[in-house]
Structures are given as C-alpha cells and as structure tokens.
Amino acid sequence: MGVDVLFGNAKFTGRNTLELDGKEIKFRRAMICAGGRPFVPDIPGLRENCLTSESFFELTELPKNFMVIGGGPIGCELAHAMRRLGSEVTVLQRGDKIMDKDDPAAGEIVLDVFKEEGIDVRFGSELQKVEPRDGRLCCTIKHGDHEHELVVDKIMVATGRIPNVESLDLEAAGVEYHRRGIKVDKHHRTTNKRIFAAGDICSPFQFTHAAYAQAEYATLNALMPWPYRLNAKDRVMSWVTYTDPEVAHAGPPYSEIEKQKANLDTYELPIKDNDRAQTESEHRGFCKIHCKKGTDKIIAATIVGENAGEMIAEMSLAITQGMRLRQIQESVHAYPTRAEIIRNTATEWKFSTLTSSMKSMVGVWFKISRMFG
C-alpha cells in the first residue's frame, strides 16, 4: 500500500516538522491520535497500589473485597461484574449519585439493583490514603467530618481519563490544548492548519466507536480541499453503559438536554409495558424520547433495559437522518421484541396530538356506529 510504519517516540519540533527518536521528519499534514490514559488522583499510596481500566484485566484471582473509586460508567460496570463474580464490592462516590452524566432515572435504576445485589455504594466519600497491611490494603476514607478505615484486597480507580499531551511538544507546532485535550474545530483541525487530531486526545466522548468515527472524518478532512470537508459537529453520538440493565443514550448528553428542557417535549414508556420484557420477567427500565417542542423531530433518546445497547442504534439513525416520531410510529416492528417499545413510545406522541374536540368526535362516531350496526 506504500505506507511507511515507523516505531518510536515522536515530538514536534516545528509547525511542519517532528522528531522521531532523533530523526527529523517533515510533513504536509499530520494527525495526532495519541489517545488518553486513566486518571489516578494524587492520593498517598494509591498510584502504586491500584488497578485501572487498563490493568484490571490482568487479575488472575478473584479478590474477596474489591473497592471502586468513582461511580461513573466504567466504575459501575466493573463493580457490577465483580459483585456477580463473587467479590464483596464497595463503591466510593464523591457526589450524591452514580452515573451522574446520564438521565438521573437511569442512575436510580442501576443504584436500586446495586443495593439489591449487595454492592455498598458510599456517597459523599473520599479516599484519603492507602497503606499496605498484611498483604491487603488499608484505606482511610473521609465522609463529611469523619474518617474511618476499610481493608480491601484490590482497589480499582475509575475517575475518568486524561489526554496524552505531555511528551508531544505541541507548543513547538503551535497546537493549543487544555486539560481536557487538544483544541479542534468542527473539521477536527487543530490551531495549526496542517495538523488534525482525533480520539481521546481531543474528544469529550471517550469511547472506542467515537475515536473511530472521529479518525474517519479527520483523515478525510486532512486529505480533502476545504469545500469538501466534513462537519464532525453534525455527527450524532451514542453510548452504552454495560450494567444490568444496560443504559443507552443517543444524541446530546443529558446536561444539554437539561438546559434545553423548556424547548423539548418528552415521551416515555416503562419497560414493563413491553410484552417481550414481561415474558422474561423484566420490569426495570424505560424508553424516553426527547423532541423539539411542538414537533415530533427527535433530538435525543435514552433506553434502559436488557439489550438497550442494541436498541439505541435505531434512535441514533433516526436522529442522524432527521427522522420524526411519525415515521417511527408508521413503521412496523416485529412482535414480540423489546425494540417495539420504541414504536410504542412514538405512539404516545401520536395520542398527544389528538385534541379534546377530536376525541369527542371519535366518541360520537363510535356511538353512531353502534346504533346503526
């Protein structure tokens, strides 16, 4: 294919030059995809005694007592997995809720499951220090004005990710960045017009599928002339938290939905109203669709339930293509499937469009029909 693959440590030396292990390389275009890494808080004894999402899967034995720092998606996923494998699990969460970037109703459902299954979630709690003790780890935890100790076998840190910007000498290339990563425009171009970036090093969406999508657009934009460049801001992002039940979302994040709620109409159905869910004794979850106020144009959606991650693809497609609830309501979904809850939620919108006079007319029509057979 004519692609040269060079291994080594690279850093920029100018706006169109970089150094790779002492060798200078010139470029017309460059792409930065250096990724990110788990953030480990600066807590005495933690860094040398913790697991992260990158080292967690190196475990070869099941720890009896397992502590997770952070109640976000990764923390909740691994806490749930370890509990079902048999560990006693404690989650330390500094705030007052888990999965605080998702719809609060979703977090409440997952929290209820955690409580039922014996996961100890401690809100308003912060780790102060970690000390090895007799082959285990003694953790000093602060809750309010009080401190106490908890001895565990393993500690998992799930407190977010940070971009790998330190060793690249971005200043030499005129590439601006901040604590969340490299600054990019809608075309994924940095402040140096020759250099583009994609993935965890520049994105608020730190998912594998997000990095792939961004790299796709960034590469095309780096190679194409200006009029043909693709607008990455137009892409709809979706994501899934793999707890049980799963939590899936498509569209702007919940924080944006909350800001726009005065301009949105929301339609919702509980998963227990879905026949397939009933046959499998599933009662936790919901489908919630947000539309532009006064219309059926879909803005965002959240689905909580078994296989929610599979169902959210339909909503991601609908939002991307500017579809409306009318089109979903008119489509025929197979019965009995969980995905049918999406169409039934769209039917809730359909019912909401019936005015009182229309309902009265329908009632009169039924009466007349019964009178005359």
Which sequence ranges carry the predicted segments?
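Feature captures the FAD/FMN-dependent oxidoreductase FAD-binding
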Residues: 1-29, 121, 128-139
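Short, acidic, Ser/Thr-enriched surface-loop or helix-capping motifs
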Residues: 7, 185-186, 292-293
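Short loop/edge segments at beta-strand edges and connector loops
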Residues: 7-9, 14, 34, 52-54, ...
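Short hydrophobic core segments
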Residues: 10, 24-35, 68-69, 89, ...
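Glycine-rich dinucleotide-binding loop and its adjacent helix/turn
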Residues: 34-94, 117, 171-191
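FAD-site-proximal beta/loop scaffold in flavoenzymes
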Residues: 48-63, 149-228, 329
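Rossmann-like dinucleotide-binding cores of NAD(P)H-dependent redox enzymes
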Residues: 57-58, 63-67, 73-148, 204-212, ...
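Flexible, glycine-rich terminal cap/loop adjacent to redox cofactors
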Residues: 243-253, 258-373
